[in-house]
Amino acid sequence: MYLFLALIIIALHILLLFYFGYTLIAVFRGAPPIPSLSSTVKRMMRLAEIKPGEALIDLGSGDGRILLAASKLGAQCLGIEINPLLVWYTRIRACLSKASSVSVRRTNLWKVDVSQADVVTIYMVPIFMQKLKEKLQAEMKPGSRIIAAVHPFPDWPPTAQEDNVFLYRIPH
């Protein structure tokens, strides 16, 4: 019995170390995993004006709440997340929610091709917003939309804004 409890405690410690290790990586490569408030997610979905069948990519998808909200609107959703624990957590949530249009890939967001996305959602720390703006403007098709939570892009006025959520459109 004591051996079993000791093994559980050791396993929990390993999982915590694993999680915090990937959190540190995320901090230095984009943003720490901070879940968006449900009110922010609702504003993001309103501004995105998602139509059934559109492709949404969430860069830094965390626990998948944006993916699940967009899938309810009919979007085909792809989450990009570097933390494997959050990838599996999102996959489990999607399965339990019967959200078959949600998939998640464990990879670095800077390596992802976003050219097929109709909508990209982000919640990124300010120091990476300029680099991300350049990537999205270079790769996304004209007319596609970007929804940024909390931090706007520098030197790019949003098309629309609702509180701390910003809508950008790739020009035609």
Predicted regions and their residues:
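A short SAM/SAH-binding and catalytic strip from SAM-dependent methyltransferases
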Residues: 115-131
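Conserved SAM-binding motif I beta-strand of class I
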Residues: 76-81
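Conserved class I S-adenosyl-L-methionine
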Residues: 53-62
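S-adenosyl-L-methionine
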Residues: 1-51
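C-terminal substrate-binding/active-site "lid" region of AdoMet-derived donor-dependent transferases
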Residues: 127-172
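Conserved SAM-binding loop
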Residues: 90-91
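Conserved SAM-binding loop of SAM-dependent methyltransferases across substrates and taxa
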Residues: 63-75
